[in-house]
Amino acid sequence: MKKKYKTKFPMARIKKIMQKDEEVGKIASATPILISQCLELFMADLVMKTCKITQAKKGKVISVNHLKECIKQESTFDFLTEIVDRIPDDKNEKRGRPKKTEGEDGGEEEEEEEEEMDMGEEEEEEEDEDDDDSDEEEEEAPKKGGKGSRGGKGSRGGRGGARGGASTRKVKSETSPVLKNTTITTTTATTTPTPTPTPNFANSPKDIQSTSLKKPSARKSNTTSPKSSPFLSSSAGSIQSPPLNNNNNNNNNNNNNNNNNGNFNNNNNFNNNNNNFNNNNNFNNNNFNNNNNNNNFNNNSNNNNNNFNNNNFNNNNYNSNEDENNNNNNNNNNKNNNNNNNSNNSNNNNRGQQFLSSSTASTITLPSNQYQPLAPISLPVLNNSNNNNSSNNNNNNNNNNNNNNNNNNEHILGNLNNNNSNRKINTNFDEEDSNHNINKSNINSIMNSSNNSIDNKDNGFNSFTFSNNNSNFNDNNNYNPNNPNNNNDNNGNGIVLPSLSSTNSSSTLPSFSSVPPILNTNNSNSNNSISHILNNLNSKKPNVEDEDFD
């Protein structure tokens, strides 16, 4: 309302006049605005009628006489007759403000109206104005005194607040600007010695607060976190550097120090006794430990999942695990010395051997974060000709499982491990194709019942020859990384590893497609048929007496 209807009449004055009557209570804020608008309309009507009288008399300035005549002529202005009679004529004494000869007519008319209103109630208005001014100053005084801008100490209405309020009241009550300046200077002069008063309990908490506010910097220095040092922690984490040397992990099936990056270690030798061949795959005459598929190639151990056992043969117990784990286990009970393969699986004739414990040839994937010298390796499993093999002890691959507790004279096509005898197998692999598939393999099982051993010269388990970079894996304790093209003889001079400069994310290792010629799945030649191999084995039958097996 105030912004929309701007008036020149003071709202406080109108409100004060309205509240002179005792019956009038509170007044709404819109009421003085409406009254000011009524006053404007009334003044405009009065001026227009007075202007007509002035024009009739051929005058240019509206005078008091013109107003008197207008009020006397118009019946609507009868309530103003008493006021007009008190106003003297222009020729007589002039009371009130002097007239302005210059300016617009509207400005002169407003001045005349104000004179007209003030003349009738001069005495009462002067008293009312004094009262209004004092009230307004009292309302503004506590606001300014509370801030303590002129009173001194205490922004919350303390000791200096009352002084400041009193000083501001004195300043406003006095009208001369010179006195205002003097009072300001006197108050400031009186408040200057107040900052160091006598010790009081009221002032002590403020002093304590002032001292306590000086210590946030020390607290911030304590709470700030220390700078992260690259030596203390690393966002990328610790770098896993594989151990380059794994010296003689004796008969360890778990191999916590395996080279997980696919590196063949210098001291991880392919021995007949204790040394582990690491890449998460222990390829020993003692342990062939595949940690990914739990397929163990063991000559001495019967306690691994999915054992790749060349007839685990002990002094007291012969554990063949026949017909316990999988419907597709081969119950090869051989009572003859010819090592006949009596298979109960109809899929064993042409499909050959399934590798590892899966429906197809499983692969062992190596970590691809740092080094990729080696790739997935496919390992042979003897006499397991069906698929859908899981890693939960489903494949117990035993060749020629004999059910005899007296094991001294049994002839098994595989690794015989009697704790009191030395039995070895010669497995010669010839490489022909670039796919690392060994298509020709001969196992000459010449067995002697007197010493329970196989001739080591012709049938020694000497070497696995990979076609990857002409590297040979031998059973001796030497490793020559500087001679990748070393072709070893039957005795073997060391393990020559594939080059580590492979940049492929998944390089491939050669896969053993077959260990005995019976199990070759990649070659459909009639030379590799079961009957042909059995005939060859019959022709090379050792001179051992037949025994009856229970």
Curated annotation (Swiss-Prot):
A single GO molecular function term of this UniProt record: protein heterodimerization activity
Domain spans labelled Histone-fold: 7-71
Function of the protein: Involved in transcriptional regulation. Component of the NC2 complex which represses RNA polymerase II transcription through binding to tbp and thereby inhibiting the assembly of the preinitiation complex.
GO cellular component labels: negative cofactor 2 complex; nucleus
Biased composition (Low complexity): 182-193, 225-238, 245-350, 382-422
Stored Pfam families: CBFD_NFYB_HMF
Top-level taxon in the UniProt lineage: Eukaryota
Ranges of compositional bias, category Acidic residues: 104-140
Compartments, record wording: Nucleus
Species the sequence originates in: Dictyostelium discoideum (Social amoeba)
A GO BP annotation: transcription by RNA polymerase II
UniProt KW Transmembrane helix keyword: no
Protein name according to UniProt: Dr1-associated corepressor homolog
UniProt cross-references to InterPro entries, sorted A to Z: CBFA_NFYB_domain, Histone-fold, Transcr_DNA_Rep_Reg
Biased composition range(s): Gly residues: 148-164
Predominant location: nucleus
Keyword Methyltransferase found: no
